[in-house]
Amino acid sequence: MRTFNSKEKKFWDWFVKNKTKLEEFIDSNQKDYSIYLELTSELKSYNELLNPELTGDEEGVYCFIVTPDGIREGVEPTTKIIYSGPEIVGWKFFRFRQAKDKFGIKINEVDVDIADIKILRKLDIENKGVDITVCFKNYEDANSDFKTAGFLMLDHVVGEMNMLARVDAVDFLSWNDIPKQEETITLLALRKEIEEKLY
């Protein structure tokens, strides 16, 4: 087990004690949220900016992700809590949402897949940053679920660390409002550009 202070030890002691309940929660397709709510409370006692995500991977390993939900001030505590964690058989710990090649999300009536998004971007190579506009196929400005879905798509496809470190501004548009002279790229192409040109 790595060395960590009493605040971090308190969180990880709770996690180890409740490991079986967390595994049962993941295996049950997250039907009873009580243990997840306890986990959220424990993590926010450590730092109020942090949020937990629980899932399983294709190899049957349980995954615990800590995310600051795009808030830069949460980067340091996210890193600290994950790096202070113990080794637990059958578990992997991740700081930030990891980039995926495939991802979709449904929030109320907003159902979004990678193919439903085009990206406008303005790279600033000198300052290693990029401004982006997320363009949805059926975007409605009055429906805030589109923006929530957009930020989650960015975190999960482009990668939360890339978003925190390299994306300066995010805006939203409908496909119908994309200027004809502007070139659009996919979310996957955006991730590639950021990783190849801005680091």
Language-model-detected regions and their locations in the chain:
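Long, contiguous binding/interaction regions
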Residues: 1-61, 69-199
